[in-house]
């Protein structure tokens, strides 16, 4: 299933971020928790049906973080929930899940090949990379014999893709950006009494990073737009509220 998206991985990435939002509302919200409770089962089923392992990993990492942020004693819930899902899940889901740990799985073999290809590209072009959108064009030049696919559109790994396309300095800047963002969000989480938005943003970052080790989600425009909304909403809302108050005050002064 891919919903209304062009690819099932885009769809699963968006579902992963929505799950972050719903779980954060359930754990940290004091009101309006009915709708996330109602949609959570549908979100979990929809994400499971995509058979997208990177999104499963990202969602689990994000939910685990939210449990820890709420109360570290809740961390034991995650393996219990996963165990229940595995028990009640259909055979196709279980097979897809267990294939994650099978080094002989064709999909996994191709991922190993992509890591090798990306490393060679970085070795040959460490400063500026091979250039934006050039990875698929040069793929066959670096492709090892054991690779499954003749060409892949990207390397299915965010840090590796950035380094291969744009060089190690660009990767360093990206790491600095994510580290600064995470530090700022955690600081806001500790300071603010209403923690829903900051918890959602932190979960979105962790989900992106965990899933991004197996998928180039940072280069997916639909995923990136929702991700950026979630991580900046915490800062944008107070600014919007201040502007609204200022406009309201100006309107009152101008009224006869």
Where does each model-flagged region fall?
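Alpha-helical transmembrane segments of multi-pass inner-membrane proteins
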Residues: 3-69, 76-81, 88, 176, ...
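Short "domain-exit" segments at the C-terminal end of structured domains
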Residues: 252-256
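A membrane-periplasm/extracellular boundary helix in multi-pass inner-membrane enzymes
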Residues: 50, 67-108, 113-124, 132, ...
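Transmembrane alpha-helices of multi-pass inner-membrane enzymes
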Residues: 73-80, 197-213, 217-246, 251
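Membrane-interfacial segments
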Residues: 27-31, 73, 98-101, 185-193, ...
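Membrane-interface micro-motifs in multi-pass membrane enzymes
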Residues: 2-15, 163-167, 218-227
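Long extracytoplasmic/lumenal interhelical loops at the membrane interface
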Residues: 2-3, 101-116, 128-166
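Membrane-interface anchor segments at the N-terminal boundary of transmembrane helices
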Residues: 162-178
């Amino acid at each position: 299933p891919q919903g209304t998206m062009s690819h099932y991985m885009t769809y699963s990435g968006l579902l992963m971020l929505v799950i972050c939002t719903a779980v954060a509302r359930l754990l940290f919200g004091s009101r309006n928790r009915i709708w996330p409770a109602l949609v959570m089962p549908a979100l979990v089923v929809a994400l499971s049906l995509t058979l997208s392992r990177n999104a499963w990993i990202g969602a689990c990492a994000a939910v685990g973080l939210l449990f820890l942020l709420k109360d570290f004693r809740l961390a034991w819930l995650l393996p219990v929930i996963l165990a229940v899902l595995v028990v009640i899940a259909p055979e196709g889901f279980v097979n897809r899940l267990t294939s994650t740990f099978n080094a002989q799985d064709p999909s996994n073999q191709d991922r190993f090949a992509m890591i090798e290809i990306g490393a060679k590209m970085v070795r040959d072009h460490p400063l500026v990379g091979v250039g934006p959108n050039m990875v698929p064009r040069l793929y066959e030049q670096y492709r090892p014999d054991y690779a499954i696919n003749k060409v892949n559109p990207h390397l299915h790994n965010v840090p590796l893709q950035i380094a291969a396309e744009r060089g190690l300095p660009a990767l360093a800047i990206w790491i600095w950006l994510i580290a600064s963002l995470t530090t700022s969000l955690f600081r806001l989480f500790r300071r603010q009494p209403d923690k829903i938005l900051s918890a959602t943003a932190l979960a979105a970052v962790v989900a992106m990073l965990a899933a991004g080790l197996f998928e180039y989600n940072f280069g997916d425009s639909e995923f990136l737009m929702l991700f950026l909304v979630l991580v900046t909403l915490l800062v944008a809302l107070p600014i919007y509220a201040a502007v609204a108050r200022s406009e309201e005050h100006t309107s009152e002064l101008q009224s006869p």
